[in-house]
């Protein structure tokens, strides 16, 4: 909410929604509300979001900072019926993307693709690996 009022409304820069960071600074909004507000700032450009999970939860070690990124992404990413690209932030990089596909996208040509060029396909829901 602060980014929308303080940045987007003043200078028009689109907001990149970050699922993990939203857990720590909700602005009084649900995940879906914050996501859709961020998506509304992109105009005619396909929106981009960031997705990561907590290393503390992954390792089940309370000594690890909750903000630290996990090696892999385990939960299915909720898009709430919207169309946007997702950048996966995970320590295992391409292996994290591969494992996500194996867990959630099996036998579905709408998986996560790695690299700068998008493959030609019907779906526009393509997730990118962050470099």
Regions flagged by a language model, labelled:
Residues 1-47:
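Acidic/histidine-rich catalytic cores of soluble enzymes
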Residues 52-131:
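C-terminal accessory extensions appended to soluble enzyme cores
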């Amino acid at each position: 909410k602060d980014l929308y009022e303080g940045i987007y409304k003043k200078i028009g820069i689109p907001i990149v929604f970050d699922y993990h960071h939203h857990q720590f600074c909700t602005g009084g909004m649900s995940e879906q509300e914050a996501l859709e507000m961020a998506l509304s700032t992109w105009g005619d450009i396909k929106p981009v979001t960031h997705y990561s999970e907590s290393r503390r939860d992954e390792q089940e070690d309370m000594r690890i900072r909750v903000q630290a990124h996990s090696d892999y992404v385990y939960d299915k990413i909720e898009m709430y019926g919207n169309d946007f690209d997702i950048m996966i932030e995970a320590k295992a990089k391409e292996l994290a993307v591969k494992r996500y596909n194996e867990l959630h996208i099996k036998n579905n040509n709408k998986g996560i693709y790695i690299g700068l060029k998008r493959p030609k396909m019907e779906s526009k829901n393509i997730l990118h690996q962050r470099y």
